[in-house]
Structures are given as structure tokens and as C-alpha cells.
């Protein structure tokens, strides 16, 4: 089988690896001048800093962890602490230690803060019971919180910041986020149960190392960088890929895997079916301006609240504002710390690099489209992959890429 893959993120790379291992001929098209998608490692003064994909764990990233082992890529343990800073309320708290919960020592005698902490515990317990009973299936986060009569403080100081940080969502959009998806993610990552916390890890030397190792193991000429695909024409006998190089060129393939964002995939299809148009068109995306810098002004004001993930609210913007401490996460020099901020309110001093990442918005329409899109795999010799098939994380992208490859292999075998 001669198959084209469009997109060299984790989904496309995983599919390419599986297909070439099975003896098929693969051409992997990438519009950018580098492979990896949301893997984005910047080198600064001899230090490799990740700006996109950062962490994984053995329990919830089994396919990805196995891939790293196969490639001989080592990881190191990290911490996944979280903090919230609400300057307009002069309120800060963190999850790293007991001291972090009371980063502002005045909250030790604050009935309101103690009530908030009690509400967090109550929320986690109630969420576990509701998930088991299937009681959250049709509710948004705001509807769920109102249904269970949780206090406003829980929403503003915990639920919305956490949802915004996890999915790079604008705070104003978090209330419409499906409650079941939010709660199931927390549950699967050990946040709703009194169990051993998941052991999070980062790639030693930066995540780009695994991309480079994977690409090096592909057959020569598999990857075609700086080659944007402009149109995909399908017929009964194959697929024509129209690409832009120095000029428009065409190439013929047996099948195609679209390992891109859903909206990109829809734009590439020459004559999408009604089902493809409905499923792919259900996904919305938001762009987040992402800056690597060493400006500690983007961390919570109180050092006790500093964490790996820091949500710092800005009432003057509708965008999510999260700062990741890469020094904590990757064990990098921390004087001053290496930081990655999404949508900084002002330009950071000591800025090193900036890039824009686009993230899927998992509203109810998108979640319903996941199953519909999976059912379309194989129709018109076309397959789909990407992190939008799951929670939007690296493991989801890899799993979908492997599934698309397996389906294409099975379809080709069935044709003979």
C-alpha cells in the first residue's frame, strides 16, 4: 500500500511508524519546516526548554511511554502542582504543600477560605459519586455546579481556573465545558480518589528528542517538510494529493490519513461528504500566544503559592492566562526561572521565544462528533487522527494515529 499522511504531530508520526513497520510505503507531508506538531523545544544557553507538550505518566500514557522506551528516550520525575492567583481579590493558593494552601497567611483565620477548602473536598467526593451513577452526562460545568449547589467561590477559585489551565480555554468558555469530560479527566488522573498520586514525568533533554529519534527510524524520504497540502481529491481507485512546493504538484496514493486539526482536514477535502462536513465542522479551535521567558512577574505574588502550573487571572482579558514553571517541571536552572506563559497580559521582560498554538475546544458538539468521525474512518479511502479524538492530549493523538494505521492496513488486506 502506498499511503499519504498529512501532518507530522504525534498522530501522524505514530501512524507513519506503524505503517512502515508493516511494510507499507508512506509519504508524510508537513507544511511547517519542522516535524512534531505541538512538540516544541527551544534551546537557550545550552538548556532545552519545552513550550508545547511537557508531561506524561505511565498509567495514563501507556502507548506513549512504550514508544519512548522503544526509541531509547529517558524521562525524569516531575511535580504537577497547581496554583491560583486572583489579584482582583488579593487571593492566592497553591496545591504543592499545606503551606501553599495558605500562601496568604491571613487565610489561616479566614472562615471564607476554610469554607472554600471544604467545598473543594466536597466537590471531589460528590463528583466521584456522580460519575459512578452517570448523573453528569448531559450537564455543562456551570449547570453541574448549580445543580449540586456548590458555592460561587468553588467555581471562581478552583473549577474554572483548573479547566482553563488543563485545556487552554478562555475562562468565559469554561462554564459551558461538558461536566462529564472534566470530571472523567480528573478521575482518570487520580484527582477524585484517595489513592497514590500519578507519577508525572518529562523527557530528559526536551521532547524534541523523541521526535528526532522517531523520524530517524523512518525510511529515507518518508518525511517531506515545508510541503503544504492544498487539496485532496478522492475517487474509487485512489487519492490525489495536491501540494505546494515551488509550484503546485500532484501525487497519487492508495489511501490518506489526515493527522491534522479537524478544521484543517475539512478545508483540504475536495468534496467532503455530508457526514465528513458535519463531524469535522463540529470542532472549534482557539489560538493561544505562548511565550518562553524568565520574568517572575508572571508568577503568583507570594512565593509560597508558586507551582508548576500557575493560573493568574486577569479581569481585563477574556483569554486564559497560565504560566508553566519549566524550571520546576524539567529541572532547569531557576535563578531566574524558565517560564512559559499563555497569552501574557503584557510583554514579558527577558522574553526568549514566542509561538502560537491552536487547541480544540471540547464543547458537547465536539464530543458527539468524536464518535461520528471515528465511524467515518475508511470511507472514501480516508482516515482521521489527532488529539481531538480524546481529551486533547498526547496519548490521545498517538492512540488515534495507531488506530487509523491499523484500520488502513486491515482495509488494504481485505481488498486483496
Which residues does each PLM region occupy?
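N-terminal glycine-rich dinucleotide-binding loop that anchors FAD/FMN and/or NAD(P) in oxidoreductases
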Residues: 41-65
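N-terminal Rossmann-like FAD-binding beta1-loop-alpha1 element of flavoenzymes
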Residues: 2-28
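Mobile amphipathic helical/loop "lid" adjacent to a hydrophobic cofactor/ligand pocket
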Residues: 61-179, 183
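Mid-domain catalytic core of redox enzymes
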Residues: 227-360
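Helical element adjacent to the flavin cofactor pocket in flavoenzyme catalytic cores
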Residues: 184-245
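Conserved flavin/dinucleotide-binding core of flavoenzymes
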Residues: 96, 318-416
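Glycine-rich FAD pyrophosphate-binding loop
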Residues: 20-44
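Conserved Rossmann-like nucleotide-cofactor binding loop
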Residues: 11, 34, 263
Amino acid at each position: 500500500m502506498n499511503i499519504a499522511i498529512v501532518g507530522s504531530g504525534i498522530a501522524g508520526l505514530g501512524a507513519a511508524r506503524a505503517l512502515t513497520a508493516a511494510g507499507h510505503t508512506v509519504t508524510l507531508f508537513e507544511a511547517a519546516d519542522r516535524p512534531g506538531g505541538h512538540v516544541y523545544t527551544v534551546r537557550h544557553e545550552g538548556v532545552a526548554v519545552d513550550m508545547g507538550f511537557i508531561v506524561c505518566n505511565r498509567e495514563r500514557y501507556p502507548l506513549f511511554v512504550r514508544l519512548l522506551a522503544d526509541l531509547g528516550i529517558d524521562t525524569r520525575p516531575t511535580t504537577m502542582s497547581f496554583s491560583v492567583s486572583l489579584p482582583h481579590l488579593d487571593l492566592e493558593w497553591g496545591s504543592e504543600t499545606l503551606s501553599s494552601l495558605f500562601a496568604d497567611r491571613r487565610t489561616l483565620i479566614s472562615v471564607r477560605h476554610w469554607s472554600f477548602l471544604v467545598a473543594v473536598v466536597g466537590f471531589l467526593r460528590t463528583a466521584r459519586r456522580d460519575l459512578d451513577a452517570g448523573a453528569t452526562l448531559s450537564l455543562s460545568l456551570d449547570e453541574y455546579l448549580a445543580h449540586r449547589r456548590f458555592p460561587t467561590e468553588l467555581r471562581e477559585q478552583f473549577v474554572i481556573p483548573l479547566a482553563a489551565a488543563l485545556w487552554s480555554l478562555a475562562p468565559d468558555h469554561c462554564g459551558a465545558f461538558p461536566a462529564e469530560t472534566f470530571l472523567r479527566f480528573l478521575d482518570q488522573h487520580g484527582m477524585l480518589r484517595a489513592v497514590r498520586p500519578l507519577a508525572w514525568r518529562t523527557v530528559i533533554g526536551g521532547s524534541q528528542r523523541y521526535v528526532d529519534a522517531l523520524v530517524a527510524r523512518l525510511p529515507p524520504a518518508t518525511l517531506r517538510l515545508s510541503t503544504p497540502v492544498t487539496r485532496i481529491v478522492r475517487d474509487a481507485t485512489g487519492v490525489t494529493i495536491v501540494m505546494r512546493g515551488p509550484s503546485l504538484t500532484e501525487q497519487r496514493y492508495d489511501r490518506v490519513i489526515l493527522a491534522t486539526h479537524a478544521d484543517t482536514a475539512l478545508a483540504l477535502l475536495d468534496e467532503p461528504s455530508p457526514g465528513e462536513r458535519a463531524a469535522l465542522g463540529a470542532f472549534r479551535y482557539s489560538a493561544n500566544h505562548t511565550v518562553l521567558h524568565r520574568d517572575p512577574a508572571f508568577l503568583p505574588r507570594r512565593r509560597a503559592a508558586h507551582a508548576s502550573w500557575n493560573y493568574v487571572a486577569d479581569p481585563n482579558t477574556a483569554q486564559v492566562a497560565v504560566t508553566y514553571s519549566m524550571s520546576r517541571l524539567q529541572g532547569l536552572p531557576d535563578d531566574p526561572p524558565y517560564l512559559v506563559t499563555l497569552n501574557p497580559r503584557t510583554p514579558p521582560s527577558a522574553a526568549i521565544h514566542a509561538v502560537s498554538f491552536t487547541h480544540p475546544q471540547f464543547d458537547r458538539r465536539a464530543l458527539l462528533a468524536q464518535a461520528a468521525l471515528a465511524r467515518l474512518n475508511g470511507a472514501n479511502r480516508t482516515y482521521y487522527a489527532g488529539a481531538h479524538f480524546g481529551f486533547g492530549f498526547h496519548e490521545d493523538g498517538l492512540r488515534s494515529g495507531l488506530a487509523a494505521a491499523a484500520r488502513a492496513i486491515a482495509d488494504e488486506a481485505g481488498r486483496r
